[in-house]
A protein has these predicted regions:
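Active-site pocket-lining segments that scaffold enzyme catalytic pockets across diverse folds
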Residues: 1-18
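Thiamine diphosphate
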Residues: 3-5, 34-175
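Generic structural hydrophobic/aromatic packing signal, biased to beta-strands
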Residues: 10, 21-23, 86, 151
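Short active-site oxyanion
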Residues: 17-20, 130-131
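Acidic-glycine-rich active-site phosphate/pyrophosphate-binding loop
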Residues: 19-38
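Short, flexible loop segments at boundaries between secondary-structure elements
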Residues: 174-187
Length: 187
């Protein structure tokens, strides 16, 4: 499955759940913007490795909201501490989706450790995350999107040909803050 296909499924599921959605820096955010821009999406523009932490912080600060974060394997490898913090806090309203293509896709597709030996699902289990799933098909992604914890999605290497995000960082944060300040759809 291509990454943009997985992101399309995630975007549709997040929308149907009324969830806040945090997109990883670079091409994943660009692909998310292209397939399903909405005020409930927060696009990371300059902090590699922190989408998972920002998503977790949102879930803890806004417990009535469902929060989903999309991060890449390279980004999570740069911030493995987020898995232990996620395990420790264990919020029911948070799902971290790790798109694992075995490379740093936004910087030239240099291989990550997951292309060889590192297994992010096993790392999450080792950190104590209560629910960890691995998906490789569209059906598996769809069926696991209502869960909490960590979902590792195996995707192909490659960036979709999508334009840059047409919003400034100020516009992204202002509309996201305005949306997240409203009651969650599930309240």
């Amino acid at each position: 499955m291509k990454r943009i296909e997985a992101i399309s499924i995630i975007a549709r599921e997040a929308d149907s759940q009324g969830a806040l959605l945090v997109g990883n820096i670079g091409y994943p955010s660009r692909e998310l913007f292209a397939v399903g821009d909405r005020a409930s999406n927060f696009y990371m523009l300059g902090s590699m490795g922190l989408a998972s932490s920002i998503g977790l912080g949102l879930a803890l600060a806004l417990p009535k909201w469902r929060v989903i974060a999309i991060d890449g394997d390279g980004a999570v490898l740069m911030n493995l501490g987020t898995l232990a913090t996620l395990a420790d806090q264990d919020p029911d309203n948070y799902l971290l989706v790790i798109l694992d293509n075995g490379c740093y896709g936004s910087t030239g597709s240099q291989p990550t450790c997951t292309s060889r030996r590192a297994d992010l699902a096993k790392l999450a289990v080792g950190a104590g995350v209560s629910e960890v799933k691995v998906a490789a098909t569209a059906g598996e992604v769809r069926s696991d999107m209502a869960k909490k914890g960590v979902l590792v999605v195996k995707v192909e290497i490659g960036n979709a040909d999508v334009p840059v995000i047409e919003l400034s960082s100020e516009e992204i944060i202002e509309r996201f803050m305005a949306r997240s300040a409203q009651p969650s759809p599930s309240s």
